[in-house]
Amino acid sequence: MKSVGTWLLATSLLAMTGVCADERDVRMFAHWAGDHETRAFRQMLVDARLYGVVPIHQLLRSASDWRLCRASPFAVAPTAQWPAVRSTLALIRTLDEQGILRRFEVVSAYRDPKLNACAGGAVGSAHTRAFAVDLLLPDWADPNPLCVFWQQHGQAWNMGLGRYPSGRIHLDTAGYRTWGGDGSAGSSFCARPS
């Protein structure tokens, strides 16, 4: 009976901490990181005071279709894209500080062009040329404050905000735009009513 109680407590604690939608967890990341260089990237985050804005094992997740595409589950963005990493993480930190984006899980970030194509990503995707994150919110979370922020401050941040039919939300700082399920601005959950 004690093990059932412990299991229920652990499950409850996991549920309270946010979303857990991806098998690429801390253990899988630690195994991967043992064979891949991440020190310079981590140091860049520390120097920019952005380390921990997103857990590193989530921040380095490649496409969710990594298995299907026979790619790596994690990837470090090229150094030329690190300024975009910093700006996107600064945006996420601001959204957190304003109470707009408190609980979330990053399920996809940098992707190399080959993996992006295999995973069905857009040609010229911010995931490949700048830095973007796709994230999931808990079922109870209201995504509309993201739209209000985008409408009021998105242009200043050069913020891209999209939502896919799966419920995933895309964030980047690679251009002021929004889109929805069909890829157009008109289908965006942030489109202002006419």
List the model feature ranges, each with a label:
Residues 1-4:
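Positively charged n-region of N-terminal signal peptides that target proteins for export
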Residues 7-15:
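Bacterial N-terminal signal peptides
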Residues 12-13, 60-61, 181-183:
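Secretory-pathway extracellular proteins and peptide precursors enriched for disulfide-bonded cysteines
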Residues 17-89, 188-194:
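Extracytoplasmic cell-surface/polysaccharide-interacting catalytic and binding patches
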Residues 20-25, 40, 124-194:
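Catalytic cores and adjacent binding grooves of peptidoglycan-active enzymes
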Residues 48, 92-99, 139, 154:
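Sec/Tat-exported extracytoplasmic proteins
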Residues 84-91, 100, 142-149:
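Stable alpha-helical elements in mature extracytoplasmic
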Residues 89-120:
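Extended, low-complexity, intrinsically disordered C-terminal regulatory tails
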